[in-house]
Amino acid sequence: MKDHRIADKLIEQRFEEISKKTDALPKTQVNYIFVTDTHADEYLLKDENGKLTVFEPEDTVNDRINQIAKHLEIAVNIANKNDNIDFIAVGGDLMNAYCIKGKEHVLSNLHRSVAPLKNSLKPVLIAFGNHDDNAFQFLNPNIPAAEREWIIIDKDWNEKVTDLFPGADGEGHDDRYEYSKYYSYDLKKKRTRIIILDTMDCRRPFDENGVVNGEMRLKRICYTDQQLDWLVNRAMTAPADYNYIFISHMGIDSAVNSNRMLGGETLREIIRAFQSRSSYSFSYTDINGEEITVNADFPESISGKILFYSFGHQHSEAILYSEDINLWQVATGCENMRGGEGEGGSDASV
C-alpha cells in the first residue's frame, strides 16, 4: 500500500486555507465545494493475448477508493464546519465504465468511494458523467461478450446513487420524465438557482428487470430537446432577481469539449438569449409524436445573471470566457489523477 500521508496533509491544509478565505466573504455570496472525476472502480487492461480481461490488483483498487473517500471526508468536514458553504457538488464520472463484473460490483465500489458524502450536513448535488453508465464495453470491439445487464440505467442512477445522499429540499425535477438526471436547486436566501444539467441524457429503454432492451449505440453525449425545454420553461423561470449557476459534467458544447455535444449549440443560444435579454426559439418532436415549439423569451425586467458554468471531464484546471454569451466557464481537474485511463472505447466514435 502506498504512503499518502504527505499528500493527505497538503490536501487538508489547502482545504483549511480555502475555508479561511470563504469565512471572510460576504454572507450573500454563493460558495460550494466541487469534486469531479473520481473514477473509483477497476481499470480493465489487456492480457498477453491482447484480450481485455485483466484487472488491476485488488490492493491497488482498494487503495485508490480509500484515498478518494479520505479526501471527500476532509471536504465534508470543511463544509459542515463552515456556514458560508452552501452545498457540495459532484461533477460526475464517479466510475470508469470498463467493468465487466456487472453493475452491482461497480455500484459497490462507487458507494465505498463516496460514502463520506452521506455525512454531509449540506445538500449533495450530483451530475452524471459519460463514464457513469458502465457502458464503454459496447464501444470496444475487443469485448464481444458485453452484457446489457452491466449497464447502469437512469433508474439505477436515481435510486442507487443520488437518492442515497443528502438531497436538497425543493429540488426541481422534470415531471415529464420520472428518471431525469437534471434538476435545479434554489438558494433562496442568496437569490440563486443552481441548475444541474445532464450531458448524457440518452435515455436507454429498459425492461421490468432494469435491463436495457433497446438500441445500444445511441448518441450518448447530448442534451435532449426535452431537457432544454425544461431548462427554458421550468429551470430558468426563477424570480427576476435570481442569479443562476450551471453545473454539469461537460462544458456547454463542442467549442469547450473534445466531444461533439448534441444540443450544445441550442444550449449556447438559450444562454445567449438570457444574457442579452432577447428571444430564441426551437422546435422538436416529443415521444408522442407531437410537434413542440419552445420560445425562450427573456425580458429586460430580469435583473439576475448567469454567474458561471462549472464542469469537469477535461481532467484539467481551466478558466474560460465566452465573449459571445458573456459567460465564465470553470473546469475543475479530476480527484483521481489516473482517472479515465484504460483500454476502453471512445465516445468520439458514437
Q: Which sequence ranges carry the predicted segments?
A:
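A short linear-motif detector with a strong N-terminal bias
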Residues: 7-14, 67-68, 104-105, 172-175, ...
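Short active-site segment of divalent metal-dependent hydrolases/proteases
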Residues: 40, 95-96, 132, 252, ...
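Extended active-site neighborhood of metal-dependent phosphoesterases/phosphodiesterases
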Residues: 10-20, 54-59, 99-230, 269-270, ...
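N-terminal active-site segment of His-dependent metallophosphoesterases
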Residues: 1-104
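His/acidic metal-ligating clusters that form di-metal
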Residues: 18, 70, 74-87, 118-120, ...
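Active-site glycine-centered loops adjacent to acidic/histidine catalytic or metal-binding residues
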Residues: 37, 92-93, 129-130, 249, ...
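Residue-level marker for buried hydrophobic side chains located in beta-strands
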Residues: 32-34, 89-90, 126, 246, ...
